[in-house]
Amino acid sequence: VDGTCLRVPFPEGEEEEGERYRCSIRQGAYKAFERNGLVFAYMGPPEQEPPFPEWEGNFTVAETDELVPYSNFQHCNWLQVQDNAADNFHTMALHAKRQVTGEKFQGTTFDEVGAASMEVPPDMHFVPVQGGRSLACSGARRSDDGHMYIRVQHQVLPNLSLHAYTSEDGHKKKLFGRFNIIRWTVPVDDHHSKMLGWRVLGPGIDTRGVGDKNLVGYETMDFLEGQVALRRPQRFGQYKLEDMPPIPSDHRAREHYKDAQYAPGDYEAIISQRQIAVHALENPTKFDAGVFMFRKLLRDAVRGTNPNASPEKFAEWLREEGAAPNSYCSGNVFELPVGRTKEEEVTLRRHLAREVVKILSAAETVKGAQREAFVRERMEALQAEVLERRAA
């Protein structure tokens, strides 16, 4: 990883000269290191190397949990893959049981994994945070008559997304649940990319015990079917988890292409936009604001009009944060009854979506257990304030 020459051929008896020669040469190399099954490389000027961001110090992994690496290939450019993560509203359409044609269910919907709350259309609130370096995507949805679920996804420039618990049913109070997926969207070329990252698995985050380590790895992901070109019957029908099966040349070359159209997953939704989506053909609603806000943050960073997101300022910020910046990523279930009127319910959803982000912003100056206690205390106060106002 540092270009060191490991050995040179030399005749017996000339070992000393061979060793001197070996130590005198070095191949050009990029600095690389391994972390929990993933290899990271720094490819910029050595004198400008930023610290590796250990989000929250340990990626919020509980002692009972672990980081499980995965690599998922995508037949399109990286930006529209990242768009999918910023589009927090899409779960109610793409991943809803009612969208599957002819009841040909294949595991692509949240209802099939007992997390129907994710199929409820949320009220969305998008806020650029951390000096314009990232975006907090706060969605408020009613999970049952006694609970309101606020899920905050964190999109970090240029290609990182931090996802809260993906199997939340929203039927039990939970404040400040943390990372369930950590994902970097990495370009391969203009027309292909990879999703590389970790799935956090264990009883700390997976309170419903539905995660499956045996389905996380190369060209496979456990939380919903349809994340990669190969569906599970093809991925595991002939291959083991540790194998590296061939990837189809394109999405239409798959033998199960037609079957996948009955129950499309994220892969189908992303890839079917072309290898490079034409933005001029889009028909956005207000709930797509997160996609457009993230694109603008990225565009401004590239153009230099978002100076905080420049490589130099980003590195400076990471050093100031001790290479362990805080994240807005969180899953929160409040014990709050349904509004007495539709207007009251809508007002409540929007209020909670905004206030949760404000609480997380107020906690940016503290770290670790102190921050966790601060956030939970403020969220308890938020719930009490809503209930008190309801009783007045």
Q: What does each model-found stretch correspond to?
A:
Residues 1-45:
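Active-site-proximal cofactor/substrate-binding loop regions of enzyme domains
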Residues 31, 40, 45-392:
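C-terminal catalytic domain of Rieske-type non-heme iron oxygenases
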